[in-house]
Amino acid sequence: MAADEVAGGARKATKSKLFEFLVHGVRPGMPSGARMPHQGAPMGPPGSPYMGSPAVRPGLAPAGMEPARKRAAPPPGQSQAQSQGQPVPTAPARSRSAKRRKMADKILPQRIRELVPESQAYMDLLAFERKLDQTIMRKRVDIQEALKRPMKQKRKLRLYISNTFNPAKPDAEDSDGSIASWELRVEGKLLDDPSKQKRKFSSFFKSLVIELDKDLYGPDNHLVEWHRTPTTQETDGFQVKRPGDLSVRCTLLLMLDYQPPQFKLDPRLARLLGLHTQSRSAIVQALWQYVKTNRLQDSHDKEYINGDKYFQQIFDCPRLKFSEIPQRLTALLLPPDPIVINHVISVDPSDQKKTACYDIDVEVEEPLKGQMSSFLLSTANQQEISALDSKIHETIESINQLKIQRDFMLSFSRDPKGYVQDLLRSQSRDLKVMTDVAGNPEEERRAEFYHQPWSQEAVSRYFYCKIQQRRQELEQSLVVRNT
């Protein structure tokens, strides 16, 4: 559909421009040398400034951990959050967080925008994409609301009523040929139908009754009826065959299949509202419009309607609730009038005018409704748009990693010694957190650390714990020996 292609093409073009700007980093009018960092640059956190493992000072043992301080590794399949007792998010929560993360990852950080002023073009494209997505979403909601309402248009259905006469053949071998008979056909088609799909003739009607002359065919064989059922097979026309060699007057009663169902209004209500046959919702809406126009709604209690003389004659009460109107309308709504066509089945061979045409108004589905439905169900260009989104996220992540590497190199070039010391302190803190090591080994290896006031209390506590431990061991050994 044209609207679907336009919407999908606009989104795809916007995504492509976003990705091209991020990859190439050049916008019209930009100097050739001014480029954003290329995606092919190495990624990942900055490596260690030293090569190999650090040397061990003479006289010091290699750094290690006591077995009691080591933390047991979690079992296979258990995450670090589970091993630490933290709640693990469920699948829907992960999907929502991933969606929020993706939306946030498409925005360039402020520090990168300050570093590369040309990146404002990407932010402008991102804002345009957001507006485009919001516009498409609003249009989709409008289309969904429009599809909930009946969308009909008036068309002309031309009926062709024809008949053929088969005279009797005395020398015929079968009984059918020896008796004169006639055949009546009822067919039709839409005039100027733009749709390529031809609609069956019977689909326009709920019932069809052909009433023949009762004097010729008797009270039991003068009616031919067709009524729609849930299992009805649609057909392009109806035909009736009867024996006879006399012209027959017949009456065709055609009941249109209204969708949604329509009703004929009571004559008094029809004069009041100016409607003859309409759907129930249209009748209620017209009645409400009449109430508002004539200010019949109660000024104190909006739920009630104070009827005028016409209103009281129709509903037979001076005052009623608006919620009661649909129930009271049931007695005032009648089945719609059928289409009545009088036709003469002629058996005169000299009568050449045996086909009659009639044009009737029918309601058909708006062709735009099918296009609107296909637009809502269409998934065209979705895979390509998703692929471009993934590339944009990867490119933004690459730019962030390159910014981290640039900051590292820039800080190192400004103050190599201070930056290396800060880096070592940071890595030392991270190592202590990762290995769960308590204390500070660098301070603990110096003698001044043990001359502080807390050392005397620590020694007393240590010996007290050892004495208690030995006492328990001796008591257990004595109990075992006595038994």
Curated annotation (Swiss-Prot):
Keywords annotated in UniProt: Acetylation, Chromatin regulator, Neurogenesis, Nucleus, Phosphoprotein, Transcription, Transcription regulation
Q: Which residues carry this modification: Phosphoserine?
A: 178
Q: Return the InterPro entries for the record.
A: SMARCD3_SWIB_dom, SWIB_domain, SWIB_MDM2_dom_sf, SWIB_MDM2_domain
Q: Where is the composition biased (Low complexity)?
A: 78-87
Keyword Disulfide bond in annotation = no
Instruction: Kindly state the tissue distribution recorded for this protein.
Output: Isoform 2 and isoform 1 are expressed in brain, heart, kidney, placenta, prostate, salivary gland, spleen, testis, thyroid, trachea and uterus. Isoform 1 is also expressed in skeletal muscle and adipose tissue.
Domain SWIB/MDM2 as annotated: residue spans: 258-335
User: Which stretches of sequence are listed as region Disordered?
Assistant: 26-102
Q: Transcription regulation as a keyword?
A: yes
What PROSITE patterns does the entry give?
SWIB_MDM2
Output the Gene Ontology terms for molecular function: chromatin binding; DNA-binding transcription factor binding; nuclear receptor binding; signaling receptor binding; transcription coactivator activity; transcription coregulator activity; transcription coregulator binding
Q: Got a GO cellular component term for this one?
A: brahma complex
Superkingdom is: Eukaryota
Q: Which Pfam families match?
A: SWIB
- Where does the protein end up? Nucleus
CDD domains in the record: SWIB_BAF60C
Residues that the record marks as modified (N-acetylalanine) are 2
**GO aspect biological process, one term:** regulation of transcription by RNA polymerase II
Q: What does this protein do?
A: Involved in transcriptional activation and repression of select genes by chromatin remodeling (alteration of DNA-nucleosome topology). Component of SWI/SNF chromatin remodeling complexes that carry out key enzymatic activities, changing chromatin structure by altering DNA-histone contacts within a nucleosome in an ATP-dependent manner. Stimulates nuclear receptor mediated transcription. Belongs to the neural progenitors-specific chromatin remodeling complex (npBAF complex) and the neuron-specific chromatin remodeling complex (nBAF complex).
Assembly mode: Component of the multiprotein chromatin-remodeling complexes SWI/SNF: SWI/SNF-A (BAF), SWI/SNF-B (PBAF) and related complexes. The canonical complex contains a catalytic subunit (either SMARCA4/BRG1/BAF190A or SMARCA2/BRM/BAF190B) and at least SMARCE1, ACTL6A/BAF53, SMARCC1/BAF155, SMARCC2/BAF170, and SMARCB1/SNF5/BAF47. Other subunits specific to each of the complexes may also be present permitting several possible combinations developmentally and tissue specific.
Q: What family is this protein classified in?
A: Belongs to the SMARCD family.
Protein known as: SWI/SNF-related matrix-associated actin-dependent regulator of chromatin subfamily D member 3
